[in-house]
């Protein structure tokens, strides 16, 4: 289950993002997971729940935004949904994956602890 290593990489990003704010705690992580990112969303949620306490994020919640795959013609820019032929019907150019292939940390919401 590579989702565990992806969750640890996510926490590494969060560590770097909140380092300038030592008196804060991450409360919400919003992550975009693409349809073709090779990630099982439910396994990712399970890995997050299982790893967050050991990384010091026991109070953090996870919100996932799914992203549909979208292909774009390299020649003319026409877009295609997943499942369509990967050759442009407009110009016969080849399509490339434009969206839906990544995992992106979109936002970290912090709670600032009074000192």
Locations of regions flagged by a protein language model:
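Short cysteine-rich clusters marking metal-coordination/redox-active sites
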Residues: 73-74, 88-91
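Short functional micro-motifs and their immediate structural scaffolds
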Residues: 79-81, 95-97
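Short, intrinsically disordered, charge-biased short linear motifs at domain edges
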Residues: 58-64, 72-79
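Long, charge-rich boundary regions
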Residues: 1-2, 104-115
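Flanking scaffold residues of small Cys/His-coordinated metal-binding clusters
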Residues: 67-68, 82-83, 100
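Long, charged N-terminal interaction/targeting segments
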Residues: 1-58
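Short loop/turn motifs enriched for small/polar and acidic residues
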Residues: 32-36, 65-69, 108
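Cys/His-enriched microdomains
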Residues: 71, 86, 103
């Amino acid at each position: 289950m590579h989702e565990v290593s992806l969750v640890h990489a996510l926490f590494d990003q969060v560590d770097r993002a909140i380092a300038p704010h030592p008196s804060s705690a991450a409360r919400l992580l919003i992550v975009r997971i693409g349809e073709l990112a090779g990630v099982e969303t439910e396994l990712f949620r399970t890995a997050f729940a299982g790893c967050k306490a050991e990384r010091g994020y026991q109070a953090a919640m996870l919100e996932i935004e799914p992203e549909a795959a979208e292909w774009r013609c390299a020649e003319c820019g026409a877009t295609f949904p997943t499942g369509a032929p990967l050759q442009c019907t407009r110009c016969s150019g080849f399509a490339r994956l434009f969206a839906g292939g990544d995992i992106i940390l979109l936002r970290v919401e912090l709670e600032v602890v009074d000192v």
